[in-house]
Swiss-Prot record:
Pfam family, one: Sec1
Annotated InterPro entries: Sec-1-like_dom1 (IPR043154), Sec-1-like_dom3a (IPR043127), Sec1-like (IPR001619), Sec1-like_dom2 (IPR027482), Sec1-like_sf (IPR036045)
GO molecular function: syntaxin binding; syntaxin-1 binding; syntaxin-3 binding
Gene3D superfamilies in the cross-refs: 1.25.40.60, 3.40.50.1910, 3.40.50.2060, Syntaxin Binding Protein 1, Chain A, domain 2 (3.90.830.10)
Source organism of this protein record: Rattus norvegicus (Rat)
SUPFAM superfamilies documented for this protein: Sec1/munc18-like (SM) proteins
Function: Involved in intracellular vesicle trafficking and vesicle fusion with membranes. Contributes to the granule exocytosis machinery through interaction with soluble N-ethylmaleimide-sensitive factor attachment protein receptor (SNARE) proteins that regulate membrane fusion. Regulates cytotoxic granule exocytosis in natural killer (NK) cells.
CC per GO annotation: apical plasma membrane; azurophil granule; cytolytic granule; cytosol; lamellipodium; phagocytic vesicle; plasma membrane; presynapse
Protein name according to UniProt: Syntaxin-binding protein 2
Family: Belongs to the STXBP/unc-18/SEC1 family.
C-alpha cells in the first residue's frame, strides 16, 4: 500500500529533495545516516524504495564501515556534535578518503560552531552539496506525527529539571516548525490559556516559523491556507483519556498486549508445531487501516465478513471464517497465503484482545467510564463514587497499575481529595509503593490533594453527544470537542487565544479556490499538495491513541474540507503515561529515560 498523507509528504521530501536531487543516471551512491535520521526514514520508507533510487548500500555513520573510495556518499544526518565529528572523520584518512565525495543533508539547522568546523576540515574540498532540509519529526501515521522526544515530559515537568525547561521548549518549537514547513503551512497559532508551557511554546513556534517564512515567502500561501491553525494543548487539559481502557482496536491492543515498536507477536499452530510470528502493525496493511479505529465488538465481525467475501471471490468454500478454518484453506490454496495471513493476524489480534478483556478488564471499564463521565450509562449523576471504586481497590486480582488508573480517575472527578482520604485510598488499594506516582499528577497540572477535599470538578465544558455509543465507550477525548469547534469556527478565543491575529478570509475567496483547484494542487516536487486548510494539534506531554482516532473522525466529518493532524513528543499508552508520571519526582541519575 502506498504511503498516505503525512508519510507520503515525507517520503517525497526524502526521495526528491535528497536522493534524486544528486542522482545521475547509471551512477550508484552510498547513503550514510545517524540514529535520528534513520528513525525518520524507516518510519515512512522501505529499504527497497531507497535501493531502487540508485543507492547501493545504507550505513550507520557511527559504525565501522569499509571505505568505498570509488563512490560518492549522500549523508542524511541530524546536526549534532557526534554526527558532524563522524562525518569529518570520514575525510581525514590518507592516502584516500572513505568516499569519493560528499552530498550532505542536515535534517535541521546546523549550529554555527559545527558549520565552521566543517569549513575548516579536509571535508570542505570534496563537498558537492550542503543543505538543511528541516525534517525533525517522525510521520507516525497518515495524520499523526511524533517528535520522537519521550524524555521531554521529564524535562518539562520534573522540578529537578527546571533549568532545562526553556531549552526543551525551544527544541520542541523548532521541531514543530519543521513539520509546518514540510506541509507548506504557515498557520495561525493558538494555545490553551492558563499553563505557562503552552503560551511559551506557541510564541517560540511563531518565532521559528517567521524565520522559515523569511527564507521562503511562499510558505502558507493559497486562499484557503490562511484558515490553517496550529493548536497547542497541554496534557492537564485532559488527563482522563490516557487513563481509560479503550475498546477500539488499536488503542485496546496497545494497552492490553505487549506490542513493542508496533510489532505484534503471536503463536501460530502449523501442521506439526507452533511457532512465533511477528507482524508489523502499520499503514502498509490496508486491513489494519480499515479496522484500527473500530470498536472491538465490530472488529471480529468485520474480519469474518471480509474473509468470507474474499473466499467467495476466489471460489473457496468456508462454512465459518475462523482461525482453524483459515489454516485448512491455506493448505488448499497456498497462492493466497499473503492475503489469508493478513486475515489470520487480525483474527488472532482481536481474539487476544478479547481474552484479556474477559479476564480482568471488563469489570474495570464500567467503573472507569462512570468516573470519567461523572454519570452512569443511563446519564444519572454518580452519587456514591466510593461505593463504585472500593470493590476495585480491594480486589487482589486487579494489577497495581489498573488500580492506580481507577484511583486517578476518582481524584480527577473530585478535583482532588483531602490528604487523609488519599492516604486511606492508597492503603485500601495496597499501592503504597506507587504513592509518589499518584501525587506526581500535580506536576502535570492536575489537582491531587486539596485541603477542602472538594467534591466539585474544574473540567472544561463538554459537548453533548447524541450519537449512540457502546456503554463501555461513552467518553470521548476533550481534544475532539476542541477540533470540532475549530473547524466550525466557534472555539472560544478567550480560552484559546491566538498568538497573532489570524489572517482575514473572505468567503468568496475560499469558494473560488475550491471551485478552481478542488482541495489539491501539484507542487514542483510532484507530490499532491493540499490546498484546503489544515488543523495541526500538538499536545504537550504525549498523545493518546483515542486522541489520534479523533483526528481521523473529525477529518471524515468535514468531508475532506479540513485535514486534522495530531501529534506530540511521543505516543502514549496508559502504561507509558503512568511510567512518565512515575519519573516526575526523581533525579536524573535515578531513572532510565527512554
Amino acid at each position: 500500500m502506498a504511503p498516505l498523507g503525512l508519510k507520503a509528504v515525507v517520503v517525497e521530501k526524502i526521495l526528491s529533495g535528497v536522493i534524486r536531487s544528486v542522482k545521475k543516471d547509471g551512477e550508484w551512491k552510498v547513503l550514510i545516516m545517524d540514529h535520528p535520521s534513520m528513525r525518520i526514514l524507516s518510519s515512512c520508507c522501505k529499504m527497497s524504495d531507497i535501493l531502487a533510487e540508485g543507492i547501493t548500500i545504507v550505513e550507520d555513520i557511527n559504525k565501522r564501515r569499509e571505505p568505498i573510495p570509488s563512490l560518492e556518499a549522500i549523508y542524511l544526518l541530524s546536526p549534532t556534535e557526534k554526527s558532524v565529528q563522524a562525518l569529518i572523520a570520514d575525510f581525514q584518512g590518507t592516502p584516500t578518503f572513505t568516499y569519493k565525495a560528499a552530498h550532505i543533508f542536515f535534517t535541521d539547522t546546523c549550529p554555527e560552531p559545527l558549520f565552521s568546523e566543517l569549513g575548516r576540515s579536509r571535508l570542505a574540498k570534496v563537498v558537492k552539496t550542503l543543505k538543511e532540509i528541516h525534517l525533525a519529526f517522525l510521520p507516525y501515521e497518515a495524520q499523526v506525527f511524533s517528535l520522537d522526544a519521550p524524555h521531554s515530559t521529564y524535562n518539562l515537568y520534573c522540578p529537578f529539571r527546571a533549568g532545562e525547561r526553556g531549552r526543551q521548549l525551544d527544541v520542541l518549537a523548532q521541531q514543530i516548525a519543521t513539520l509546518c514547513a514540510t506541509l507548506q503551512e504557515y498557520p495561525s497559532i493558538r494555545y490553551r490559556k492558563g499553563p505557562e508551557d503552552t503560551a511559551q511554546l506557541a510564541h517560540a513556534v511563531l518565532a521559528k516559523l517567521n524565520a522559515f517564512k523569511a527564507d521562503t515567502p511562499s510558505l502558507g500561501e493559497g486562499p484557503e491556507k490562511t484558515r490553517s491553525q496550529l493548536l497547542i494543548m497541554d496534557r492537564a487539559a485532559d488527563p482522563v483519556s490516557p487513563l481509560l481502557h479503550e475498546l477500539t482496536f488499536q488503542a485496546m491492543a496497545y494497552d492490553l498486549l505487549h506490542i513493542e515498536q508496533d510489532t505484534y507477536r503471536y503463536e501460530t499452530t502449523g501442521l506439526s508445531e507452533s511457532r512465533e510470528k511477528a507482524v508489523l502493525l502499520d499503514e502498509d496493511d490496508d486491513l489494519w487501516v480499515e479496522l484500527r479505529h473500530m470498536h472491538i465488538a465490530d472488529v471480529s465481525k468485520k474480519v469474518t465478513e471480509l474473509l468470507k467475501t474474499f473466499c467467495e471471490s476466489k471460489r473457496l468454500t468456508t462454512d465459518k471464517a475462523n482461525i482453524k478454518d483459515l489454516s485448512h484453506i491455506l493448505k488448499k490454496m497456498p497462492q493466497y497465503q499473503k492475503e489469508l495471513n493478513k486475515y489470520s493476524t487480525h483474527l488472532h489480534l482481536a481474539d487476544d484482545c478479547m481474552k484479556h478483556f474477559k479476564g480482568s478488564v471488563e469489570k474495570l471499564c464500567g467503573v472507569e467510564q462512570d468516573l470519567a463521565m461523572g454519570s452512569d450509562a443511563e446519564g444519572e449523576k454518580i452519587k456514591d463514587t466510593m461505593k463504585l471504586i472500593v470493590p476495585v481497590l480491594l480486589d487482589a486480582s486487579v494489577p497495581p497499575y489498573d488500580k492506580i488508573r481507577v484511583l486517578l480517575l476518582y481524584i480527577l472527578l473530585r478535583n482532588g481529595v483531602s490528604e487523609e482520604n488519599l492516604a486511606k485510598l492508597i492503603q485500601h488499594a495496597n499501592v503504597q509503593s506507587y504513592s509518589n506516582l499518584i501525587r506526581n499528577l500535580e506536576q502535570l497540572g492536575g489537582t491531587v490533594t486539596n485541603s477542602a477535599g472538594s467534591g466539585t470538578s474544574s473540567r472544561l465544558e463538554r459537548r453533548e453527544r447524541m450519537e449512540p455509543t457502546y456503554q463501555l465507550s461513552r467518553w470521548s477525548p476533550v481534544i475532539k470537542d476542541v477540533m470540532e469547534d475549530v473547524v466550525e469556527d466557534r472555539l472560544d478565543r478567550k480560552l484559546w487565544p491566538f498568538v497573532s491575529d489570524p489572517a482575514p478570509v473572505s468567503s468568496s475567496q475560499a469558494a473560488v479556490s475550491s471551485a478552481r483547484f478542488g482541495h489539491w494542487h501539484k507542487n514542483k516536487a510532484g507530490i499532491e499538495a493540499r490546498a484546503g486548510p489544515r488543523l495541526i494539534v500538538y499536545i504537550v506531554g504525549g498523545v493518546a491513541m483515542s486522541e489520534m482516532r479523533a483526528a481521523y473522525e473529525v477529518t471524515r466529518a468535514t468531508e475532506g474540507k479540513w485535514e486534522v493532524l495530531i501529534g506530540s513528543s511521543h505516543i502514549l499508552t496508559p502504561t507509558r503515561f503512568l511510567d512518565d508520571l512515575r519519573t516526575l519526582d526523581q533525579k536524573l541519575e535515578d531513572i532510565a529515560l527512554p
